[in-house]
UniProtKB/Swiss-Prot annotation:
Species the sequence originates in: Thermoanaerobacter pseudethanolicus (strain ATCC 33223 / 39E)
Gene name tied to this protein: aroC
Family: Belongs to the chorismate synthase family.
InterPro entries in the cross-refs: Chorismate_synth, Chorismate_synth_AroC_sf, Chorismate_synthase_CS
Gene Ontology cellular-component annotations: cytosol
Principal EC category: lyase
Protein name: Chorismate synthase
Length: 350
């Protein structure tokens, strides 16, 4: 499978086109809309979330609620577009440290930074959540589920202190990042491969996780902690039971060994940096005058860690769904499930 997204933050709509879905997959629009609503939630979000009410509209690829094998096109209307379509906006010439503004302007020869920030905005992730929701619907057919939880916000692990931490940052005109854990349950042994670097499952997951705006680090299993311990305390010993088959009592590998899923839950941690748009802007340089200035301010969140958790679920669901289709094949959901069930029997009898 593959997908692309299109659209700008304050454009008329966001679009996603998914190619390669099997036919007869039920597209539950209510579920997709619930996922989109999750992305809009979380304490510390900005004023944009009071404007938008993200809903998916399927433009192509289904009949009677099910996929038909052709490209699936999803649309999400930007309600804020109505506030911008006739508005003459001044050029943005003061790049924000930590954002794509300056590097993007130089790369694409743009003197108005809005031409960069409109697409680089995390608003694009609404389209990816819609795509990931479709992937989740496919995985549900195989009893595979993706979930997440926020572990830290602004370096604070205690959930009951997060609101106060966010409020303090807001009062200072600052922003906060955090750490998110994603767990994928029900993944069979055998997704990914050791035979080529670009087929390794952990590499694919890390690539997609790092593609999400503001994500700066990723760990799988013990991650960096594995580098601090001897091998005897890191590697998961292997056991066998007639009912369970091969299994491990620990999961330091995070469900992946040698680039291949090993049947344990896949565990990923991702670090999100603070949002680059600060109410009290940092020092920058005006690209036209070359004078020292304060960076531009765009309406933004104090933190979006909880929203990012939903986005990370989506991109991880996409990777696992795509790998399932690569391994088990099937032009229809029925064929995919038949192949998958046969594989599970093979694994049980290995």
């Amino acid at each position: 499978m593959r997908y692309i997204t299109a659209g700008e933050s304050h454009g008329e709509a966001l679009i996603a086109v998914i190619e390669g879905l099997p036919s007869n997959l039920l597209i539950d629009e209510e579920f997709i809309n619930k996922e989109l609503k999750r992305r809009q939630g979380g304490y510390g979000r900005g004023g944009r979330m009071a404007i938008e009410e993200d809903k998916v509209h399927v433009l192509s690829g289904i009949r009677n609620g099910k996929t038909i094998g052709s490209p699936l096109t999803l649309e999400i209307i930007n309600k804020d577009y109505e506030n911008w379509k006739n508005k003459k906006t001044p050029e943005v010439t003061r790049p924000r440290p930590g954002h794509a503004d300056l590097a993007g302007a130089i790369k694409y020869n743009q003197r108005d930074l809005r031409n960069i920030l409109e697409r680089s905005s995390a608003r694009e992730t609404a389209a990816r959540v819609a795509v990931g929701s479709v992937a989740k619907l496919l995985l549900k057919e195989l009893d595979i589920y993706v979930k997440s939880k926020v572990l830290e916000i602004g370096g604070v692990k205690a959930e009951e202190k997060w609101r106060r931490t966010i409020d303090e940052a807001k009062s200072k005109g600052d922003t906060l990042g955090g750490i998110i854990e994603i767990v994928i349950e029900g993944v069979p042994v055998g997704l990914g491969s050791h035979v080529q670097w670009d087929r390794k499952l952990d590499a694919l997951l890390a690539y997609h996780v790092m593609s999400v705006q503001a994500i700066k680090a990723v760990e799988i299993g013990l991650g960096f902690e594995a580098a601090r311990k001897p091998g005897s305390l890191v590697h998961d010993e292997i056991y066998y039971d007639e009912e369970r088959g091969f299994y491990r009592k620990t999961n330091n590998a995070g469900g992946i060994e040698g680039g291949i899923s090993n049947g344990s839950p896949i565990v990923i941690k991702a670090a999100m940096k603070p949002i680059p748009t600060l109410l009290k802007p940092l020092t920058s340089i005006d690209i036209n005058t070359k004078e020292e200035v304060k960076a531009a301010y765009e309406r933004s969140d104090v933190t979006a860690v909880e929203a990012a958790a939903c986005v990370l679920e989506a991109v991880c669901a996409w990777v696992i769904a795509d790998e399932c289709l690569k391994k088990f094949g099937g032009d229809s959901i029925e064929e995919l499930k038949k192949n998958y069930d046969a594989y599970l029997v093979y694994v049980k009898n290995f």
